[in-house]
Each structure stands twice: as structure tokens, then as C-alpha cells.
Amino acid sequence: MINIAIDAMGGDFGEKPIIEGVLKALEAKPFNAILVGNSKILKPLIPKKLEQYIQYEEASEIFSMNENATDALKNKETTIYKAINLLKEKKVDAVVSAGHSGASMSLATLRLGRLKGISRPAIATLMPNIVNKTLLLDVGANTDCKAENLFQFAIMGEVYAREIMQIQKPRLALLSNGEEECKGNELTKESHQLMKKIPNFIGNAEGRDIFNGEIDVLVCDGFDGNVILKACEGVATAIFQLLKNEVKQSFISKIGALLMKPSFKKLKKHTDWQEYGGAPLLGVNGCVIISHGKSDSRAIKNAIFQAINFSQSHINKLIENELGKYNA
């Protein structure tokens, strides 16, 4: 059975939504949950019928969102340090954390090490499009990149799309300010030349192309990726609020909204980041799923499902093998 370490106290809202997410996941799929945190606080939240699937790893401290990620290695009593250490010692198959994302990334890189051929790991996230989903990476691990980093991100994203998203030939693109090969800054142009070696590379793409369903993997540096991610979250929230405001304007619009309620529900589900759970940190020697600090129980449940799928695949070995083809 898969063993998943969960940073049980690292999210913005404390342990309650995290434990609720773990319980929902256990009701859907069997796995062993290792809850990292204060067992005196956590144990009363676990129903007897699920106790057999729960273990505890004591951790007395939480790495604060206000702390610098570079300090994560210093305090070995934090929940995220203990969780990553369990993975390093191969006592678990994956880690899920809604805590400090910088600390998670820093500890995973330093404690677990990078995959062969990878110079920097990348955070990958799923973005909704009009057909299905687009994998965007990097979305925050590396604000400054070299062309070789983006090339490695492309390989990791392509393998992830193939193995986890089940896309046989994922269409891979590079984010730029125009589709033409000559567009972009020096980093983009140099990266484009490297990515031309990849058979599934379809060229440059603009930000709007994330949503048209014609791209499966979009590569960029962590600065641009994070700006895109946060902007999209804001736009989605604003659109639904504008719809609510318009619905309230008249009786007819309220009737129309009532008739459209099933469609609105489907749309909201498709665009809701909680449905996607978390973001895998690709390129480290293990499975680390980074969840949003504001994750509710549904997001934690879905992040755990991501961790299970990742752990059951051989994605890290496949990434190394794929990179080896280009480094030979």
C-alpha cells in the first residue's frame, strides 16, 4: 500500500481542513497516511473506522509563512522538515504539504537531491482550457532561468503529461510574446533553439493560447509562470463575481440563472483550482506535491490522489531516461 506523509499543520487554516481532506481521500482510496504534526491535536480528529490507516510522526513546530525559505534547513523540528525527511529515508512514497512552498522546494532539493541531468526543479500546475487542461511550468520555483533550465522543464513536462495526464503525444510550447520564432527575449530565442530538438515541440505560444486547448504543456520561467497563475486566479474570481452581480439586477436574470445553474456548476468546477489539488515539484528525487496554503479539504484530497498517481508511476526514472537521449 502507498505511504503518504502529510504536513498536517502547515496550511493557512491549520490542521482541520487538512485532516478532513485526508479522511475524504481514505474513504475513496486505501493508503497509509503518516500525519506529521502534534499527535495530541491530531488524534481526536480521526474516526475509529479509519484509525488503521493512520500513523503519526511527531513534529513540534510549524515553518511560518513569514520565514525565509533559506532557513528551512536549520530547524529540524518543523512539520515540513520531518515530512521531507521521511521521504529521504524511504519510509514514505510521497509528501503532500500546504505549508510554505519555498521551504518545501528548498528542503526537497537539498534533502532529496535532483534527478540525474536536472539542474533545477520546477513547480508544475494544471490550468483549465476549453477542452481539458494545460500543464504550465515553472510557476514559482525559479525566477531567473537559463535556456538549459527551460529545456529541462520541457522534458519533465512532456513526460508528466504522457505518464500522468495520459496524453500519448503531448503538444509542447514555449511562452513568448509572439508565435514567430524571432519573437521573445534572448532567453526565449535561445530556449526555442534547444527545444526544436524535441519532436513534440510546436513552437512559441502566447499567454492566451493556454486556454484554447491546442497546447498540452507550456514552458516558462518561474517569474512569468507565477504571474500567469495568480492573474488567472484573479480573473476567474472576478468573472464569477461579475456574473453574480448581473444576476441580481432583475427578476428575469434570476430565473435565467436558475435555469443555467447546472451549467454554472460545471463551469465553476472546471475552473476551480481546488479541483486540481496541488502542484508537483518535478526534478527532485522523490514525489513532493505542493498545495495552496488556502487549500480546503477537497484540495487536500485531490493533492493526495495526485501523490498516489505519481508514486505508482515511474515518472522520475522516465524523466532521467528521456534527458539521457539528449545528453548522450
UniProtKB/Swiss-Prot annotation:
Its EC number is 2.3.1.274. Keywords: Cytoplasm, Lipid biosynthesis, Lipid metabolism, Phospholipid biosynthesis, Phospholipid metabolism, Transferase. One of its GO terms (molecular function) is phosphate:acyl-[acyl carrier protein] acyltransferase activity. GO terms for biological process: fatty acid biosynthetic process; phospholipid biosynthetic process. Pathway: Lipid metabolism; phospholipid metabolism. It catalyses: a fatty acyl-[ACP] + phosphate = an acyl phosphate + holo-[ACP]. Pfam families: FA_synthesis. It is an enzyme of class 2 (transferase). It comes from the Bacteria. One of its GO terms (cellular component) is cytoplasm. InterPro entries: FA_synthesis, Phospholipid_synth_PlsX-like. It is found in: Cytoplasm. The keyword Lipid biosynthesis applies. NCBIfam families: plsX. Belongs to the PlsX family. Catalyzes the reversible formation of acyl-phosphate (acyl-PO(4)) from acyl-[acyl-carrier-protein] (acyl-ACP). This enzyme utilizes acyl-ACP as fatty acyl donor, but not acyl-CoA. Homodimer. Probably interacts with PlsY. This is Phosphate acyltransferase. The gene is plsX.
